[in-house]
């Protein structure tokens, strides 16, 4: 049965929306997640699946990436379903002297901020990734903390646990409008009915 009210309506059921629904439901909120298509069928199904810090800029960008690592480790321990999170390290391949100069500056700033990243020589790069074209490898930046996940499995795992925590998950309704009165959201209008908040 389609809900008529909720404390929180989460619009979008990809990795971000499913994460929001899971953490709010776990905190005891009455949550409804609305996804107009299939579970994780939009951006979450088309991303590179990296849990990645190597290319992040110093400051808030790298701090958010580091927080993402913490959340992935937490979710790996909490969620029943394996979402294939692997922390196997990451490489940013350097192909010439110009790229090397750029990467060295990036590495220096990252090292100053205390994040693990190092410059490795072509032999070490090819040891880690032997299928690269040897003649094009000048070196690489290597981050031992980077990894990847299966975003589709992550969405499914989050949905499963959010539902166990009491969240309502609805796939295929479309949110058409947001009702606002006196500066507050009062509801989400969908093609299946309005959910009051």
Features from the language model and the residues they span:
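Gly/Ala-rich phosphate-binding loop of Rossmann-like dinucleotide-binding domains
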Residues: 21, 25, 161
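Helical element adjacent to the flavin cofactor pocket in flavoenzyme catalytic cores
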Residues: 141-197
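Beta1/beta-strand and adjacent pyrophosphate-binding region of the FAD-binding site
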Residues: 2-16, 32
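Short loop/edge segments at beta-strand edges and connector loops
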Residues: 35, 87, 121-122, 171-173, ...
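Dinucleotide-binding Rossmann-like beta1-alpha1 core, especially the glycine-rich loop
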Residues: 48-128
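Glycine-rich FAD pyrophosphate-binding loop
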Residues: 25-45
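A short, glycine/Asx- and small/polar-enriched loop/turn
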Residues: 98, 129-137, 179-186
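Conserved dinucleotide-binding and phosphotransfer motif residues
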Residues: 27, 113, 165
């Amino acid at each position: 049965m389609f809900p008529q009210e909720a404390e929180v309506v989460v619009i979008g059921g990809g990795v971000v929306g499913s994460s929001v629904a899971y953490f709010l439901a776990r905190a005891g909120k009455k949550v409804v997640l609305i996804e107009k298509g299939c579970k994780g069928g939009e951006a979450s199904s088309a991303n590179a699946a990296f849990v990645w810090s190597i290319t992040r800029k110093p400051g808030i960008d790298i701090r958010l990436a580091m927080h993402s690592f913490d959340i992935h480790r937490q979710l790996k321990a909490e969620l029943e379903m394996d979402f294939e999170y692997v922390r196997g390290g990451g490489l940013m391949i350097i192909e010439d002297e110009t790229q090397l100069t750029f990467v060295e500056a990036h590495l220096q700033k990252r090292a100053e901020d205390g994040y693990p990243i190092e410059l490795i020589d072509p032999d070490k790069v090819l040891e880690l990734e032997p299928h690269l074209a040897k003649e094009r490898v000048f070196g690489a930046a290597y981050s031992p903390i980077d990894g990847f996940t299966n975003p589709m499995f992550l969405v499914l795992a989050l949905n499963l646990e959010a539902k166990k925590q009491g969240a309502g998950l609805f796939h295929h309704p479309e949110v058409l409008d947001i009702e606002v009165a006196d500066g507050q959201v009062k509801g989400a209008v969908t093609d299946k009915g309005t959910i009051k908040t």
